[in-house]
Structures are given as structure tokens and as C-alpha cells.
């Protein structure tokens, strides 16, 4: 059990039989009445975001989420095959189970698979990945003075905005949480 006073971003709780992850929280102490905690929660099964309010000190059941380190091996049709780093067991996951993480998956990449009651609910990518630019418009001389950006397609199929000086074949570092360019490799 977790007290509502201990809720922080990233903490997992179980509400109405479903796992939720705290995205935002605000502890409110009104002039009159009891204090309460206003939260924004993400359902880890469906991805829906809901706002809930709890009384200060209210006890909530903790969601027991198992984190397993796995390595992405290859894709086979609509399935993506991962290998457990400890037991070497292989597990196929569908694109629906992986969600938006699929656009950054590269062979031999290590990821964390989150399970709740034996069911895969999320794939955690590394915060940054290094990928090669396979398609982008050529930069024109003198373009960098404005600090503009242009779209670029990466080797995994993901599309991000990159600075104008980036060329096809260059390796760029990308933040997987915000889908933004960080720098050249």
C-alpha cells in the first residue's frame, strides 16, 4: 500500500484493477477543509490519461510491476522477438504490445519489458539511441544562420526534425522520450 502523500511521477499504483503510472501530482492545502492530492495518471494497459483526486493520507494499492531486461533480436512479420538477458528465453511481442517504441527498435538493442500479472504492458527504451539518417533534404549553403530544422528519416523508419547541416549517412543521437534530435555522433 502507498500513501497518497508518497505519490511522485513514475510511481505505479493499482486503481479499479488496472495499473496506473503517476505522470503529475500536486499536493493542495486549501484554506478551509482537508488537504488533498490531485494527480494525472496514465493507464499502463490502454495508455489513457485520467485525472484523479485523493484525500491526503489515503492508502492506495501498489501495482507490482516486474521489469525484465531483454534484447531485441529480430522482427518476424508482425511480431518482434526479444531474448531474456538472464534465461536466454525468446519471447515474441506484437506491434500493439510494443506501442510507439517500435519506431526506435534496432537489432541487438537492450530494452526493459514491463509486466503486470504476467501480461506485457510496456517497453522501456534507453533514454537516447544513436541512429543513421537514411533520408533528408540536402542542406543549402548558408542555411545554418537561421537555426532551422528539416525532417529526416532514420534507419528504423522514425521521422524526426534535425538541424539543416545534417546529411544522409550521418549518425545522430535521439531522445526516445521526446522524439527530438540531441546531437551528432
UniProtKB/Swiss-Prot annotation:
GO terms for cellular component: cytoplasm. Involved in peptide bond synthesis. Stimulates efficient translation and peptide-bond synthesis on native or reconstituted 70S ribosomes in vitro. Probably functions indirectly by altering the affinity of the ribosome for aminoacyl-tRNA, thus increasing their reactivity as acceptors for peptidyl transferase. HAMAP family: EF_P (MF_00141). The keyword Cytoplasm applies. Pathway: Protein biosynthesis; polypeptide chain elongation. It comes from Synechococcus sp. (strain JA-3-3Ab). This is Elongation factor P. Keywords: Cytoplasm, Elongation factor, Protein biosynthesis. GO terms for biological process: peptide biosynthetic process.
Amino acid at each position: 500500500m502507498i500513501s497518497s502523500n508518497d505519490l511522485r511521477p513514475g510511481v505505479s499504483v493499482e486503481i479499479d484493477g488496472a495499473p496506473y503510472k503517476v505522470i503529475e501530482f500536486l499536493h493542495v492545502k486549501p484554506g478551509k477543509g482537508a488537504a488533498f492530492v490531485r494527480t494525472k495518471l496514465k493507464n499502463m494497459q490502454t495508455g489513457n490519461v485520467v485525472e484523479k483526486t485523493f484525500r491526503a493520507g489515503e492508502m492506495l494499492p501498489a501495482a507490482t510491476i516486474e521489469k525484465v531486461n531483454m534484447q531485441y533480436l529480430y522482427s518476424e512479420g508482425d511480431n518482434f522477438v526479444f531474448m531474456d538477458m538472464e534465461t536466454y528465453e525468446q519471447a515474441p511481442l506484437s506491434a500493439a504490445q510494443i506501442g510507439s517504441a517500435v519506431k526506435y527498435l534496432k537489432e541487438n538493442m537492450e530494452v526493459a519489458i514491463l509486466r503486470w500479472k504476467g501480461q506485457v504492458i510496456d517497453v522501456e527504451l534507453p533514454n537516447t539511441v544513436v541512429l543513421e539518417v537514411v533520408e533528408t533534404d540536402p542542406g543549402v549553403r548558408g542555411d545554418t544562420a537561421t537555426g532551422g530544422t528539416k525532417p529526416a528519416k532514420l534507419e528504423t523508419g522514425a521521422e524526426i526534425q534535425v538541424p539543416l547541416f545534417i546529411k544522409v549517412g550521418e549518425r545522430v543521437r535521439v531522445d526516445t522520450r521526446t522524439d527530438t534530435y540531441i546531437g551528432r555522433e
